[in-house]
Amino acid sequence: MLLQFRAKTFFNNIAQDSLVTLITKRVGLGYRFLSSLCQPKNTALDSEGYKILFQTAAKSGSVVLGKLAHGHMIKSSLNPCLYLLNNLLNMYCKCRELGFARQLFDRMPERNIISFNSLISGYTQMGFYEQAMELFLEAREANLKLDKFTYAGALGFCGERCDLDLGELLHGLVVVNGLSQQVFLINVLIDMYSKCGKLDQAMSLFDRCDERDQVSWNSLISGYVRVGAAEEPLNLLAKMHRDGLNLTTYALGSVLKACCINLNEGFIEKGMAIHCYTAKLGMEFDIVVRTALLDMYAKNGSLKEAIKLFSLMPSKNVVTYNAMISGFLQMDEITDEASSEAFKLFMDMQRRGLEPSPSTFSVVLKACSAAKTLEYGRQIHALICKNNFQSDEFIGSALIELYALMGSTEDGMQCFASTSKQDIASWTSMIDCHVQNEQLESAFDLFRQLFSSHIRPEEYTVSLMMSACADFAALSSGEQIQGYAIKSGIDAFTSVKTSSISMYAKSGNMPLANQVFIEVQNPDVATYSAMISSLAQHGSANEALNIFESMKTHGIKPNQQAFLGVLIACCHGGLVTQGLKYFQCMKNDYRINPNEKHFTCLVDLLGRTGRLSDAENLILSSGFQDHPVTWRALLSSCRVYKDSVIGKRVAERLMELEPEASGSYVLLHNIYNDSGVNSSAEEVRELMRDRGVKKEPALSWIVIGNQTHSFAVADLSHPSSQMIYTMLETMDNVDFVDYTLVHFCSVT
């Protein structure tokens, strides 16, 4: 009370111009002081005074000061002019109070282009691009003279939605209205074209700009990083430095991210050189640079360097903890140890009194997914609800991914429905949830709903759907999605082209898959891996190995998926020596720990060439003795070579691991049957009957239109089964005539 009394007494005795000056300097003295500032009965402010208050609140982000000043203005009975109302509107937008801003905007008796620009800018900064676009159209219909800020909001919508057609139309309007030389707008256009994957147009604008600033460079660099380019961002940073421009933390962070794209020694060395340069400039501890450095070292598997950077930081906040936790989860194959370290960091930051952010929960949920710990994930979910973050779109996406991995699509749908802002990330996660659980029709339904909700699919959504089409042999649907990708410009993204390679290869069209591979301008390790695996599956072992060697020649470091493709190629080609060599190379030269798939492939390779004992010893010496898939690969080879001795041992081990799975019993029965040991084969049948094990029928499926039809032997469950069997019976009764003879008779 004493502070409030002294403040009132003091303010009542000073002139208005001095009062405004003091207001500007004393914003941070606390809520009671602000209340005293705005409420003295004998203090009158005119429009200029209120303008200073609103501008100060906007600059400092103090919505409390802004609201107090707004309330004081209402009580003063001042009739605000349009200029003052625009300052008030701008204050609410800058303070992210868009609800108040919209109410004020709707009630303003008069509005000009500045009014529209303030709210458009507020919407775009908060990610509400559709509302910004609606305001742009409203301003145009009102015949207001649109300026660079108005167009910037609309172009931001085009970039975020990857709407190239609309973006090019707006670009044309910018040129027609004489705004094409505005550096601010050129930067926005560069950013828009970059986000739409049209780097050639972005570069053309950049080259024609006579007054490039740091934002121009940053926009182009981040654009190349976004589409997966690695060399171009480094070249641009070097040119930026040669031109005498100060390197921004944003540019350095983007280029460090580029060094992570192709995880090869050359780029990592360049990243380390940039690290040294940032240390020289004193920027090493900048949060953007530090986060990018942690990410680079973690993705390269240099967790020791990342931990060292983290431990040397003089002060740690939520962002640095998030970066370090993410570092443990960046590997191709997240180990239980890495997940455990991520959990430890999460608990450590809480012990230090740091409140987890939505980003923290997102990465911790990723650790739960990697460790497949649904129960711990549910506990984290409860903590998220306690912190009132359950409606956050990023957390919603992470929860959907967790429940998808656990096969719980219903829980995933509930998380999706409770997300406050269903953006492209949450839509993509929900689609992925259905794809992972082999619900292709539901995935397509969601993809169509995505379009009807006026949200443009991004490159990851498109590549995900194309991969799903490849897995389910739905080539027609995949080609439709690729057509959309080409039309929207998304096909320029490396991830989309990679999915195209897999889709065409799985549909049997290797020439087209190879053509797409050749067209990729900046193939990454995923692109090479897709091509290697495709060639391997088609039996082109030598070609697959040539692609692998070419990848290494281009300086791209192989990952687990690339080596898996190589081992599959060796397996299908019977190249035992090469397969063993690459397996050792993966472990010793690249320090990549083989996973279950690698061991299974090597077991299959040894088994196919009759080295059954070696294959059995390999499983026993690995850490995958309890993994049925690996044993099943060996059991299949035992049947090929009619080895009932090893086959019996392997089958008994499988029966221990999967007592209710029929496959092991059937394979062992067939081994005995093929070996002529009929009595043992009958014993296996008796064992199946005693244990109540039934053979599951094999299924085939076909996609017609957007519907998947599955069939089993003697299946009567299909709604058109009667018609199908009638047609089959009719075809059986048809006497087929030699086509050549019929054709000859018709010609003569």
Swiss-Prot record:
GO BP: mitochondrial RNA modification
Pfam families linked: E_motif, PPR, PPR_2
Per-repeat ranges for PPR: 46-80, 81-111, 112-146, 147-181, 182-212, 213-247, 248-285, 286-316, 317-356, 357-391, 392-422, 423-457, 458-492, 493-523, 524-558, 559-589, 595-629
InterPro entries, A to Z: E_motif, Pentatricopeptide_rpt, PPR_At4g14850-like_plant, TPR-like_helical_dom_sf
GO molecular function (one): RNA binding
Region (Type E(+) motif) residue spans: 706-736
Keyword Transferase among record annotations: no
Segments crossing the lipid bilayer: none
Region called Type E motif, residue ranges: 630-705
Keywords: Repeat
GO CC annotation terms, alphabetical: mitochondrion
Family: Belongs to the PPR family. PCMP-E subfamily.
PANTHER family: OS07G0578800 PROTEIN-RELATED
Name recorded for this polypeptide: Pentatricopeptide repeat-containing protein At3g13880
Organism the protein comes from: Arabidopsis thaliana
